[in-house]
Amino acid sequence: MTTPEIRGVYPGSFDPPTIAHVAIAEAAVRAGALDRLDLAISRIAFGKDTARQAPAEVRGALVERLAATRPWLHVVVTDAQLIAEIAAGYDVVVMGADKWAQVRDPAWYDSVEQRDAALATLARVLVVPRPGFDVAGADVLDVPAHLAGVSSSAARAGRTELIAPECRPER
């Protein structure tokens, strides 16, 4: 009898994928004992300015470069925008503490009951801590503190050393 595969999902814009995204993915695989981690890219990212965002297919192609060297890593492009929708069917969902705060904030729902119902659909939640954000109700990932300041925004602004090595522009 084979053991069922333990699958996780890490939703994000990955525009571009950074060294922090890689470290988070690796920490999630370890902490969640995952056999597979899907990086889920929404065609239209919820709450993000899409005017300056690379198309989902371009972002997906970059993330595929990461997956090419990591057999446990896969890429999915989705029309879903809400974490609860993206995480449906997975054993683990990975997110930053800022996103976890948003997921738990009733202001994003029609009612507290709707929020509670959405939270109840989530399986295990692995959260990357960030200063100023509460991580109650989730398991905290151990990610090196020096990566806290890494962002895709900074990478797009010219800090190419923050981009995952496989995804850096050729010089």
Region locations from a protein language model:
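Nucleotidyltransferase catalytic core that binds NTPs
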Residues: M1-R171
